[in-house]
């Protein structure tokens, strides 16, 4: 699907939940998506790979208000869309990702999909992301 900000590609991932040490819900995605887009990152920067295997965070640093739905979709295959545009901030490089199914899961858990940083594409309420890497300095050097 073509947008004003690049092309959207459809992919799938597997939903995983953990409760310890904190509540986390992620969509495990194909590592090759990250590997492919990392190739395009500037070679003049020392960009570290992401800390964990390729994923999209759905719940992170939040406590769900409605735990009756926690782990309801464990292991379920979920569709998502991602853009072929690499974004970066001071530390991170990422791809934007979108999924109405992931938004629904957040709603069931009593979490907001309100996104205040950027405007999501029409039809979506939240922008998720796929981390490609970071430029954090190694504290042990």
Task: Show where each model-derived region lies.
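Histidine-dependent nucleotide/RNA phosphoesterase domain, centered on the 2H-phosphoesterase fold
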Residues: 1-141
